[in-house]
Curated annotation (Swiss-Prot):
Bacitracin is thought to be involved in the inhibition of peptidoglycan synthesis by sequestering undecaprenyl diphosphate, thereby reducing the pool of lipid carrier available. Catalyzes the dephosphorylation of undecaprenyl diphosphate (UPP). Confers resistance to bacitracin. The lineage of its organism: Bacteria, Bacillati, Actinomycetota, Actinomycetes, Micrococcales. Its EC number is 3.6.1.27. GO terms for cellular component: plasma membrane. Coiled coil: none annotated. InterPro entries: UppP (IPR003824). One of its GO terms (biological process) is regulation of cell shape. It catalyses: di-trans,octa-cis-undecaprenyl diphosphate + H2O = di-trans,octa-cis-undecaprenyl phosphate + phosphate + H(+). The gene is uppP. It is a multi-pass membrane protein. This is Undecaprenyl-diphosphatase. It holds the Pfam family BacA. It comes from Arthrobacter sp. (strain FB24).
Length: 286
């Protein structure tokens, strides 16, 4: 009995810690899913938190986006809805942004459904995570160095919106980073660091909420969530992710308005190499 109580307490602690990790890393170009996978390997349960846990806790961080940008989002939704009744012209900047978010969300929705089984199994290997951290870290470094960084979101085109969307879809592979992929795409297309980050946050809302609610539906319609953490522990992690994520959004936007992404590039490369060593010496299992 005491052993069972101890196990329950450990699960709550681990879930809270993973919620903190999710909130700290979701909006930074360093891959929150990779960090959940890595940190989970070092915890007493030494288990992958699972795709369902990851997707549901992301509901917390995306709720933080909605709260942080609520004025922008209300304005965009109103203008977009107005185009459906022709009260607002389709070239209205806010209405266009609404359509661009929808358009940019299509690739990750389609590819996520097609490759769902692989995403929840083989692609969660830490060998793949380590490789993606390094490879996409180097791509981010190139984009940050060569991007013109002169375009604002008012100049976002539908073609660029699709390109953003496919970059976001790459984040279905843990280690790529959803924000990292979309920010990299924005820099390569000449957008400023802050503009690339802002659109990245808005673009994530439909896809992440769709994925999280789908996983939540699967959990509620079956016996429960798979993995070491039950629904109550996952709810705690989601709440913590929301609070921490809200703070990180403001800090990150301020940071990238005056500095480069070099810090995150070096961090990704260091973490990827460290992960290779840990896996190679069997300190953790893939």
């Amino acid at each position: 009995m005491l052993h069972d109580v101890g196990s329950i307490n450990v699960n709550w602690f681990e879930a809270a810690l993973l919620g903190l990790v999710q909130g700290l890393t979701e909006f930074l170009p360093i891959s929150s899913s990779a960090h959940l996978r890595i940190v989970g390997s070092f915890l007493p349960n030494a288990a992958d938190p699972g795709a369902a846990f990851t997707a549901i806790t992301q509901l917390g961080t995306e709720t933080a986006v909605i709260v942080y940008f609520w004025r922008d989002i209300v304005r965009i939704v109103k203008a977009w809805a107005g185009t459906l009744t022709r009260r607002v012209p389709t070239d209205d900047p806010d209405a266009r942004m609404g359509w661009l978010v929808i358009l940019g969300s299509l690739p990750i929705i389609v590819l996520g459904l097609i490759f769902q089984d692989q995403i929840e199994s083989v692609l969660r290997s830490l060998w793949i995570v380590a490789t993606m951290l390094i490879v996409f870290g180097l791509i981010l470094a190139v984009a940050d160095a060569v991007g013109r960084q002169e375009r604002e979101l008012t100049r976002l085109t539908y073609k660029h919106g699709i390109f953003y969307g496919f970059a976001q879809a790459m984040a279905l592979i843990p280690g790529v980073s959803r924000s990292g992929g979309t920010i990299t795409a924005g820099l390569l297309m000449g957008y400023t660091r802050e503009a690339a980050a802002r659109y990245s946050f808005l673009l994530a809302i439909p896809a992440v909420f769709g994925s999280g609610l789908y996983q939540l539906y699967k959990v509620m319609s079956k016996d429960g969530i798979t993995g070491p953490y039950g629904l109550p522990e996952t709810a705690l992690a989601t709440l913590i992710a929301f609070v921490v994520g809200y703070v990180i959004i403001g800090w990150f936007l301020k940071f990238v308005s005056t500095r480069s992404y070099r810090l995150f590039v070096w961090y990704r490369i260091f973490l990827g190499l460290a992960l290779y060593l840990l896996l190679g010496f069997n300190v953790i299992s893939a």
